[in-house]
């Protein structure tokens, strides 16, 4: 079974490899991160019962947000050791030439 920091690293890599993800999110009220010793993985919170993956998605969206989240969950859940995997979309990254 992977350590929390190994799982956080793997979840971050999986999320960033997902179409539509611009970057890892920072969380809303507190920083979303997993720590072990001097190492920090931003955007992933590994708890005893769940893994939270915080992301910033690109606009325009290549597909609906629930599909992007589903792809992240499909990549992370098999590595999560039975923990519930949740995706939080913290923000949208809008290109300078895009209108909302």
PLM features per residue range, with description:
Residues 1-21:
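N-terminal presequence-like segments and adjacent domain-start helices
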Residues 15, 36, 45, 79-81:
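A generic structural signal for short, solvent-exposed coil/turn residues
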Residues 17-24, 78-83:
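Short secondary-structure junctions
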Residues 18-21, 27-34, 61-65:
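Short linear motifs at secondary-structure transitions and domain/linker junctions
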Residues 24-54, 86-98:
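Short edge beta-strands and adjacent turn/loop segments
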Residues 55-59:
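Short beta-strand-to-loop capping motifs
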Residues 61-83:
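Short, non-transmembrane amphipathic alpha-helical segments
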């Amino acid at each position: 079974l992977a350590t929390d920091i190994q799982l956080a690293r793997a979840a971050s890599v999986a999320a960033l490899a997902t179409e539509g993800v611009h970057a890892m999110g920072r969380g809303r009220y507190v920083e979303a991160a997993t720590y072990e010793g001097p190492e920090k993985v931003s955007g992933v919170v590994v708890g005893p019962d769940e893994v939270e993956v915080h992301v910033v998605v690109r606009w325009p969206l290549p597909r609906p947000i629930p599909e992007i989240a589903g792809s992240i969950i499909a990549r992370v859940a098999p590595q999560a050791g039975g923990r519930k995997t949740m995706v939080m979309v913290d923000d949208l990254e809008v290109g300078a030439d895009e209108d909302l």
